[in-house]
Curated annotation (Swiss-Prot):
Belongs to the ustYa family. Keywords: Chloride, Transferase, Virulence. This is Chlorinase cctP2. Chlorinase; part of the gene cluster that mediates the biosynthesis of the mycotoxin cyclochlorotine, a hepatotoxic and carcinogenic cyclic chlorinated pentapeptide. Within the pathway, cctP2 catalyzes the formation of isocyclochlorotine via dichlorination of the Pro from the isocyclotine skeleton. The NRPS cctN initially catalyzes the condensation of L-serine (Ser), Pro, L-2-aminobutyrate (2Abu), Ser, and beta-Phe in this order to produce isocyclotine. The lineage of its organism: Eukaryota, Fungi, Dikarya, Ascomycota, Pezizomycotina. It comes from Talaromyces islandicus (Penicillium islandicum). Residues 1-14 have a biased composition (Basic and acidic residues).
Length: 314
């Protein structure tokens, strides 16, 4: 009897174990089925987002490739690559269609006076510029020179030197000044490291490298407008072939050409009418550095200038 009972117990145990295994198997399958459905739902939801993200990345890459980010110059905030200008192998400043005299006149007409600017100390600090020589009509401003205008001035002097030599004349520009200008342009060229590739078109016997090739440039007119807004009232007077301005009795005469409506007009008028009034920014003994001949020339210049003012007002 005991053996039979034991056999029944074993069979019951086996049956229960089999049931449990089957139940676990069914439940495990149910869990796996639920997990698969959840994973499938997540994939279905994520797929559109992944596709949209992929498309946006492609569009962004294409935008960056096709259109460069906008960049601006340090001080005048000139936009890089703003205008398209074709390169010309020869212009009216150098071609054979104009006479030497006509081309010389064009070069001599270049006036870089506007490149002298007066910038307030606050603005120069914001721009990260070192403090400069004090502007004579406002102690809170310094005098700066646009480097673009400085370089342009050098090209004018180089023309004057080579033109005089070509004409068989002794150049009036000093060779030392020419060396300075050549070195200035050399430094500029190496600083900018222009990587534009000039193409070599087939022009027969004429090797006109880069002729007509389009270039992306800053707008010079916008630089001109920026410096004019900060005018130092400077003017080169009676400029010579040597690149020097003469005919002034005092250095301050060069800073008396303010644009109409300038707030410095009263100071300048007093400076002219009263015979060089010390504005407070000049050394007190500045006038004593002049020779008697220079003082006489200055007095004559003052008289003639004031006479002209009266004539204009009459």
């Amino acid at each position: 009897m005991e053996g039979k009972t034991s056999r029944y117990q074993d069979e019951a145990h086996d049956s229960a174990g089999s049931f449990n295994e089957e139940t676990e198997g069914l439940m495990s399958g149910l869990h796996r089925s639920t997990k698969k459905r959840k994973l499938s739902s997540i994939v279905k939801l994520a797929t559109p987002f992944l596709i949209v993200s992929f498309i946006l990345n492609i569009v962004q890459l294409a935008y960056i490739t096709v259109r460069r980010p906008e960049c601006y110059s340090l001080y005048a905030k000139l936009k890089e690559h703003e205008i398209t200008v074709p390169f010309r192998y020869a212009t009216e400043y150098s071609d054979d269609e104009h006479t030497h005299e006509e081309k010389d006149a064009l070069w001599n007409a270049i006036d870089i006076s506007e490149g002298f600017v007066a910038i307030s100390n606050d603005e120069s600090d914001r721009l990260g510029l070192p403090r400069s020589k004090t502007f004579p009509w406002d102690a809170n401003k310094g005098i700066y020179v646009s480097h673009g205008h400085h370089a342009l001035h050098c090209t004018v002097l180089l023309h004057a030197y080579t033109y005089d030599a070509h004409q068989g004349k002794k150049p009036l520009v000093s060779y030392h000044h020419i060396e300075h200008c050549l070195d200035l342009l050399r430094q500029d060229i190496m600083c900018y490291a222009n990587d534009v590739m000039d193409y070599t078109p087939d022009h027969g016997d004429n090797f006109l490298t880069g002729e007509g090739q389009q270039r992306k440039c800053r707008d010079w007119n916008k630089l001109s407008a920026w410096v004019k807004e900060r005018s130092a009232c400077y003017k080169t007077i009676n400029i010579t072939r040597a690149g020097e301005d003469h005919g002034v009795a005092h250095q301050l005469d060069r800073y008396t050409y303010c644009p109409p409506g300038s707030p410095y007009e009263p100071l300048i008028k007093a400076f002219k009418d009263l015979g060089r009034v010390n504005t407070g920014n000049l050394a007190a003994d500045g006038f004593h550095e002049l020779t008697p001949e220079e003082l006489a020339a200055e007095a004559q210049a003052v008289a003639e200038h004031n006479k002209q003012i009266l004539a204009d007002e009459g």
